[in-house]
Regions:
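Short, hinge-like loop/turn segments at secondary-structure boundaries
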Residues: 51-54, 102-105, 128-129
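Glycine-rich, Arg-bearing micro-motifs that act as flexible, cationic patches
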Residues: 109-135
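Short, flexible loop segments at boundaries between secondary-structure elements
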Residues: 138-144
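A short acidic, glycine-rich active-site loop
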Residues: 54-68
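Small/aliphatic-rich secondary-structure junction motif
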Residues: 3-53, 76-85
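Short, well-ordered secondary-structure micro-motifs
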Residues: 18, 45-48, 96-99, 122-124
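Structural beta-alpha unit
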Residues: 75-110
Length: 144
């Protein structure tokens, strides 16, 4: 039924649990996984020189965070014996990166947490999960 599952993660505790559950789902269905993390780009500043130095530091920090998230996910997949690719994107609208990556990678479904780092604010402002559910043409499994 499913051959390739996209598993987005933001590194939050629930998201890590969703990665574990998504990898188990892949193992049970014989699917391979692609784990995606999406970081937010650096907010622009009118102070060009200051922004350049801060921008580089911000990018380095975001890359480190993304690499750590993906290493955790890859380790979970490796322990389960599931083939897993990893991707990191930077986007102001993470849901778009999730939907586009699922399409580009020719995934059959998306397996993701019900909410992430934004917590209550995410619920009030509209969660990325809700946006993925609205915009994806693929089945979306929501882990709670």
């Amino acid at each position: 039924m499913f051959k390739h599952i996209l598993i987005p993660t933001d590194g939050s505790p629930l998201s890590i649990e969703a990665v574990k559950a998504g990898i188990r789902f892949c193992k049970e269905t014989g699917a391979r996984a692609t784990v995606l993390t999406v970081t937010l780009p650096f907010p622009n500043s009118p102070l060009a020189e200051y922004a350049a130095a801060t921008h580089a530091m911000y990018d380095a920090g975001m890359k480190k965070a993304a690499d750590e998230r993906l290493a955790v996910a890859a380790g979970i997949a490796r322990e389960a014996g599931v083939t897993c690719a990893t991707r990191a994107h930077s986007d102001w609208q993470p849901f778009l990166s999730i939907v586009q990556t699922a399409d580009e990678e020719k995934c059959d479904a998306i397996f993701m947490a019900s909410h992430g780092r934004r917590g209550i604010a995410g619920l009030l402002l509209g969660s990325e999960t809700q946006k993925v559910l609205t915009h994806s043409k693929l089945p979306v499994v929501v882990y709670r």
